[in-house]
UniProtKB/Swiss-Prot annotation:
Belongs to the ATPase alpha/beta chains family. The lineage of its organism: Eukaryota, Viridiplantae, Streptophyta, Embryophyta, Tracheophyta. One of its GO terms (molecular function) is ATP binding. One of its GO terms (cellular component) is proton-transporting V-type ATPase, V1 domain. It catalyses: ATP + H2O + 4 H(+)(in) = ADP + phosphate + 5 H(+)(out). CDD domains: ATP-synt_V_A-type_alpha_C, V_A-ATPase_A. It comes from Hordeum vulgare (Barley). The keyword Lipid metabolism does not apply. The keyword Zinc does not apply. GO terms for biological process: ATP metabolic process. Pfam families: ATP-synt_ab, ATP-synt_ab_N, ATP-synt_ab_Xtn, ATP-synt_VA_C. Keywords: ATP-binding, Hydrogen ion transport, Ion transport, Nucleotide-binding, Translocase, Transport. PANTHER family: V-TYPE PROTON ATPASE CATALYTIC SUBUNIT A. This is V-type proton ATPase catalytic subunit A.
Length: 580
């Protein structure tokens, strides 16, 4: 239960009741509280206000709007005991009721109106869970604030009024009709993730990595370029300047819509900032606040992705609270219920059939960054997370030091959604699954060969192994590595990823075939050195595939890639003819 503590009315939450004494966790600095200070009960649990005005806003861990507080207090810090409503109650919103009239029956989850939130997102107003009845009044189209009654229901003789706003306790998952199997990929615009380790809309992913490996850059790239409708970005216990960077970057970033309009990314983003210099207790609440907001948009039928950066800090907050309660510590001092808390958070992700009519599906994708101390993946938080999530994008310190970004290690990462997405890939491009398998084999083979090369040198290898090493280098440096700060490579559409991979694998197959055929024939031998010297021009074109700018349009790019594919085939045919 939420309470107000002391004369400053600080926000607190009761976390344990024993006999007639209550343990209260206060979400603010508690200096100056004395014995016999009053405690006011609010008689409701820690809740989130859900309604128009969430998008483009920035909240702290217990949903206090930081912008409004800054304007009111004119201070860089949040004053103690400040009480500001989460959403602006006076702002007017354009309300448009759906085709419902007085006398119609309506139940929880039914969408009864649309509100114009911004040029990018339509905000659907649904009946809150647990409500039902016959409409006795519905407001006509017009402008209303969040305090105005827009709907009145009658059920068993009792009338109940509804505004566009409702509250929901953050620790309770919002109800759904049913959970569905996810079958659409979450396209991130990062080649290594889309092609080798795909996630789905409604999936769970973990990004563990030591400091400086680029976790934050990957989660920001997901917020900027992924194919989800809205993004909730929770900065939980990370540095304050990272949230400041997001606040500076996002309003300037634009995304191009299918109809060619440019819109600011901020219009589809909500930020929950609980940086490392804010109270630890609110850090634990911030993740729940974020997921509740995400579920609210999911219930409208949107695909939402939620970034939690980072869940390790959240686990540390749990450890601290558990220590104050004098509970029995488990591994590394974390509480024994760490794994179940993590699981209860991650299982709120998924693709669902929403309650109510019209029929709609929505999804919540959770991407959790984990920062294990010293990059040690056997840390309790990391191992508990890995037993829950389905996609693991492991970041490697050595790759980051080589300036290979995104530094996802392709030998330890995995995705358990590959089979679920096979249907989608078959439709998109029937040959893609085989190409991906081949690319993985090449990268794995390179890892095996590296030890031999270090012992005896590259020249002692067979011709096909030399070609494998060259293909792996192409894949590594020109396919998996991606520069997030260039216009042509910050976002890579899926068709470009597929075509780039196709041409590299095609080169590998043709080179191997040429070497094998010439070895059995009587003419000149074709060696790796011959291929490299004669194919210099085509090789250069393979390397520079990534410089093709998606802004030119899909047809232009596909034509270029197709021409390279045909030129490769012709080039090797000529080489073989000459060798005869």
């Amino acid at each position: 239960e939420l309470v107000r503590v002391g004369h400053d009315s600080l926000i607190g939450e009761i976390i344990r009741l024993e006999g007639d004494s209550a343990t209260i966790q206060v979400y603010e600095e508690t200096a100056g509280l004395t014995v016999n200070d009053p405690v006011l009960r609010t008689k409701k649990p820690l809740s989130c206000e859900l309604g128009p005005g969430i998008l483009g806003n920035i909240f702290d861990g217990i949903q206090r709007p930081l912008k409004t507080i800054a304007i009111k207090s004119r201070d860089v810090y949040i004053p103690r005991g400040v009480s500001v409503p989460a959403l602006d109650k006076d702002q007017l919103w354009e309300f448009q009721p759906n085709k419902l009239g007085v006398g119609d029956n309506i139940t929880n989850g039914d969408l009864y109106a649309t509100v114009f939130e911004n040029t990018l997102m339509k905000h659907h107003i649904a009946l809150p869970p647990g409500a039902m009845g016959k409409i006795s009044y519905i407001a006509p189209a017009g402008q209303y604030s969040l305090q105005d009654t827009v709907l009145e229901l009658e059920f068993q003789g009792i009338k109940k009024e509804f505004t566009m706003l409702h509250t929901w306790p953050v620790r309770t998952p919002r109800p759904v009709a049913s959970k569905l199997a996810a079958d659409t990929p979450l396209l991130t615009g990062q080649r290594v993730l889309d092609a080798l380790f795909p996630s789905v809309l409604g999936g769970t992913c973990a990004i563990p990595g030591a400091f400086g490996c680029g976790k934050t850059v990957i989660s920001q790239a997901l917020s900027k370029y992924s194919n989800s409708d809205t993004v909730v970005y929770v900065g939980c216990g990370e540095r304050g300047n990272e949230m400041a960077e997001v606040l500076m970057d996002f309003p300037q970033l634009t995304m191009t819509l299918p109809d060619g309009r440019e819109e600011s990314v901020m219009k589809r983003t909500t930020l929950v900032a609980n940086t490392s210099n804010m109270p630890v207790a609110a850090r634990e609440a911030s993740i729940y606040t974020g997921i509740t907001i995400a579920e609210y948009f999911r219930d409208m039928g949107y695909n939402v992705s939620m970034m939690a950066d980072s869940t390790s800090r959240w686990a540390e907050a749990l450890r601290e609270i558990s220590g104050r309660l004098a509970e029995m510590p488990a591994d590394s001092g974390y509480p024994a219920y760490l794994a179940s808390r993590l699981a209860s958070f991650y299982e709120r992700a998924g693709k669902v059939q929403c309650l109510g009519s019209p029929d709609r599906t929505g999804s919540v994708t959770i991407v959790g960054a984990v920062s294990p101390p010293g990059g040690d993946f056997s840390d309790p938080v990391t191992s508990a997370t890995l037993s829950i999530v389905q996609v693991f994008w492991g970041l490697d310190k050595k790759l980051a030091q080589r300036k290979h970004f995104p530094s996802v290690n392709w030998l330890i990462s995995y995705s358990k959604y590959s089979t679920a997405l096979e249907g989608y890939y078959e439709k998109f491009d029937p040959g893609f699954i085989d190409m991906r398998t081949k690319a993985r084999e090449v990268l794995q083979r390179e890892d095996d060969l590296n030890e031999i090369v270090q012992l005896v040198g590259k020249d002692a290898l067979g011709e096909s192994d030399k070609i494998t090493l060259e293909t792996a280098k192409l894949l590594r440096e020109d396919y998996l590595a991606q520069n997030a700060f260039t216009p042509y490579d910050k976002y890579c559409p899926f068709y470009k990823s597929v075509w780039m991979m196709r041409n590299i694998i095609h080169f590998n197959q043709l080179a191997n075939q040429a070497v094998e055929r010439a070895a059995n024939a009587d003419g000149h031998k074709i060696t790796y050195a011959v291929v490299k010297s004669r194919m210099g021009d085509l090789f250069y074109r393979l390397v520079s595939q990534k410089f093709e700018d998606p802004a030119e349009g899909e047809d232009v790019l596909v034509a270029k890639f197709q021409k390279l594919y045909d030129d490769l085939t012709a080039g090797f045919r000529n080489l073989e003819d000459e060798a005869r």
